[in-house]
From Swiss-Prot:
Keyword Transcription regulation found: no
GO CC terms: cytosol
Protein name: tRNA pseudouridine synthase D
Organism classification: Bacteria, Pseudomonadati, Myxococcota, Myxococcia, Myxococcales
Keyword annotations: Isomerase, tRNA processing
Gene name of the record: truD
Domain TRUD positions: 150-304
Active site: 78 (nucleophile)
BP-aspect Gene Ontology terms: tRNA pseudouridine synthesis
InterPro entries: PsdUridine_synth_cat_dom_sf, PsdUridine_synth_TruD, PsdUridine_synth_TruD_CS, PsdUridine_synth_TruD_insert, TruD_catalytic, TruD_insert_sf, TruD_pseudoU_synthase
């Protein structure tokens, strides 16, 4: 992310080291809904340490005597952290949660619900991070600026793979370039979707970086696709003078392109900016139909509200904040520290 701008570039970062131990990084999943208490699916809220979400699903499915494929999980959490999340299992009996404990895994809560938990049934993730050796005073200045200016909703480096290889493979799939890596991805649905998503994310980051460079991060342009931050609804900006104050109040945000073959470009000046980005890449929207047609395209909010709570530690500080599904804690922490450390993120 070293080529991406900071919204707090005028402020020095706190410095410091992130994630020296799993306990330094905690992620608590905020579900889209809570289990109702009745139904055929057993819902378990689990805490894991040093275990992946797949490890937890496998362990619990075996203990409950159900096939692993029947388990439900809203999002995958990294193993190098302390995380909590809900999992679901089609089990008639109500087991003793204590009996399901395993190394690095414990059940915090059990309930029931009518439906299986599905990927994406997450409202947000709550992050708590320790920054060892960080300057609390500087962190507070950056956090205050973030609260006022908003968080650029960049994708973190985890999205792109080592040295950006996933995005490079995705571009090859879109352009039709024949490479060994693109050939493998074309035959493997998981790799294909991963690579195409990485390339879409790279182009979104470029779009947002250009917008920030032109002083349009918290502005409304004629023709902008706008997203309502409370409901996710989309509309076209027809009156920038009216929509601009709503952007500033975090009611709405420009919604940048995750380019795809079914996406419609924004209108007016905003659409012209998107078209120039595609032209610079030498691609057209229709090119995203290559590789199985799975890159249909969508819109992503450019600017988010984030409130970071800070407290001192003996050797640094602790930061706590909540982000909507799909936003990256890495982006928040690089604004606070001005470092480029990579953090585990929700991999849903």
């Amino acid at each position: 992310m070293t080529d991406l701008p900071f919204v707090t570039a005028d402020l020095p970062g706190s410095g410091g080291a992130l994630r020296r131990a799993p306990e330094d990084f905690r992620v608590d999943e905020v579900p889209a809904y809570l289990p109702s208490g009745a139904g055929p699916h057993l819902y378990l809220r689990v805490e894991k340490r040093g275990r992946t979400s797949r490890d937890a699903v496998r362990e619990l499915a075996r203990a409950l005597g159900v096939p692993e494929r029947d388990a439900g999980c809203a999002g995958l959490k990294d193993k190098d952290a302390v995380t909590t999340q809900w999992l679901s299992f089609p089990v008639a009996r109500d087991p003793d949660p204590a009996a399901l404990a395993a190394p690095g895994l414990r059940v915090l809560e059990a309930s029931r619900h009518q439906n299986k938990l599905r990927t994406g049934h997450v409202r947000a993730n709550r992050f708590t991070l320790a920054v060892r050796g960080g300057d609390l005073g500087r962190a507070r200045e950056c956090a205050g600026a973030l609260a006022a200016r908003g968080l650029p909703n960049f994708f973190g480096p985890q999205r792109f793979g080592a040295a950006g290889r996933n995005a490079a493979v995705g571009r090859a799939l879109v352009t039709g370039e024949r490479t060994p890596e693109a050939g493998r991805a074309a035959r493997d649905r998981f790799l294909r979707r991963l690579s195409l998503s990485a390339y879409q994310s790279l182009l979104f980051n470029r779009w947002l970086a250009e917008r920030m460079a032109d002083g349009l991060f918290a502005a409304a342009l004629a023709g902008d696709a706008m997203k309502k931050l409370d409901t996710g609804g989309l509309f076209t900006c027809e009156d920038p003078a009216a929509d601009g104050p709503r952007v500033e109040r975090f009611e709405i945000s420009p919604a940048g392109p995750m380019f795809g073959h079914a996406l419609r470009l924004a209108a007016g000046e905003a659409g012209a900016r998107e078209a120039r980005l595609l032209e610079a890449e030498g691609i057209a929207l229709a090119d995203f139909a290559r590789g199985g047609g799975e890159a249909e395209g969508t819109r992503r909010a450019a600017r988010l509200r984030v409130e970071v709570a800070l407290e001192p530690l003996e050797d640094g500080y602790r930061a706590a904040f909540e982000l909507p599904r799909g936003a990256y804690a890495t982006v928040v922490m690089r604004e606070l520290t001005k470092g480029e450390a990579e953090l585990p993120e929700d991999a849903d």
